[in-house]
């Protein structure tokens, strides 16, 4: 019994080291030419007190040289409204830093949000990266929209609940923007995403599950996503993601977004052993012990941008 306990302890100790973000070979590993701006998804935030949406990611990037800014846009609204808010924030970052461009990284609904800015103001954007982005819509949004008629009483009840959640998140994170969850829902349906993509096609694959153009009007496009809804028995979101993944009917997904829908520009990977929240190192770092740490993925991407002169 003692031998087994010793063996188990040694194994867990070794696994803990495998899970740690890989240290940089030298200072400056993440030091991009242009500032990095992180953009949250639906019902997201920048930080609530000491708790960050991008759990441990911004600090890890800053540690080796990156200038990182975390945007706060409306938790629940259309891609275009969130995009205009982000554009205003980008201009503030450029004014504060003296930089000519930024590197945008958006998660979930943040993916289309950063794409909006890259599309309408390409001169201000060096790169746009979508992480688990709803670039071609999400089945859950389609199911909700198909089950709840626009303008109906059930829609008003559901919208009030979701708007209330958004307002609470906004209050706790210092944002007073108006929440319009019906607009957010419309943006994340397949039809809504298709309409947005027609107006802002940059980087969007022309095939169902291919890659998009790597560079358009001077902006480089990237994407990655997970494809494992359940990754850590201690994560309280694993069970809900496992249930929601049934809506994909066998298609690879992260619990909320299909792998093919996440594609934009150069696809780094669409099959990480991560669920939708693992992609931002949530909840509180409870991610897959047997997959690359999400923080490491962001550090590697910052280094990729650095090596490209971005």
Model-assigned labels for residue ranges:
Residues 41-45, 74-78, 108-112, 133-137, ...:
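Solvent-exposed loop/turn segments at secondary-structure junctions
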Residues 15-23:
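C-terminal segment of classical bacterial N-terminal signal peptides
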Residues 40, 68, 84-194, 254:
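Serine-dependent carboxylesterase/thioesterase catalytic core
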Residues 28-102, 150, 158:
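Active-site catalytic motif of lipid deacylating hydrolases and related acyltransferases
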Residues 1-9:
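Bacterial N-terminal signal peptides that target proteins for export
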Residues 50, 139-144, 232-238:
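Short aromatic-enriched loop/helix-cap "lid" or pocket-rim segments at secondary-structure transitions
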Residues 192-212:
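Active-site nucleophile elbow and catalytic-triad environment of alpha/beta-hydrolase enzymes
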Residues 206-310:
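C-terminal catalytic-base region of ester-bond hydrolases, centering on the histidine
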């Amino acid at each position: 019994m003692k031998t087994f306990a010793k063996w188990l302890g040694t194994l867990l100790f070794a696994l803990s080291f495998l899970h740690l973000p890989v240290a940089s070979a030298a200072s400056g590993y993440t030091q991009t030419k242009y500032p990095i701006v992180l953009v949250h998804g639906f019902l997201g935030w920048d930080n609530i007190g000491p708790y960050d949406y991008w759990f441990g990611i911004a600090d890890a990037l800053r540690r080796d040289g990156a200038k990182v800014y975390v945007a706060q846009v409306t938790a629940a609204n259309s891609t275009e409204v969130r995009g205009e808010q982000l554009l205003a924030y980008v201009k503030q970052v450029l004014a504060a830093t003296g930089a000519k461009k930024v590197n945008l990284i958006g998660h979930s609904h943040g993916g289309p949000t950063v794409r909006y800015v890259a599309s309408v103001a390409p001169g201000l954007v060096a790169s746009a990266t979508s992480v688990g982005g709803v670039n071609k819509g999400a089945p859950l949004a389609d199911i909700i929209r198909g089950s709840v008629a626009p303008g109906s009483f059930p829609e008003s009840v559901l919208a009030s609940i979701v708007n209330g959640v958004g307002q609470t998140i906004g209050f706790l994170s210092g944002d007073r923007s108006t929440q319009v969850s019906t607009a957010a829902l419309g943006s994340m349906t397949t039809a809504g995403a298709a309409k947005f993509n027609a107006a802002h096609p940059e980087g969007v694959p022309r095939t169902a599950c291919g890659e998009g153009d790597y560079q358009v009007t001077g902006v480089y496009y990237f994407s990655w996503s997970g494809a494992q809804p359940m990754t850590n028995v201690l994560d309280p979101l694993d069970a809900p993601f496992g249930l929601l993944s049934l809506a994909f009917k066998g298609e690879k997904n992260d619990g909320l977004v299909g792998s093919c829908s996440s594609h934009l520009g150069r696809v780094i990977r669409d099959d990480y052993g991560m669920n939708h929240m693992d992609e931002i190192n949530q909840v509180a770092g409870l991610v897959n012990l047997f997959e690359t740490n999400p923080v490491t993925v962001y550090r590697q991407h910052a280094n990729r941008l650095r090596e490209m002169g971005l």
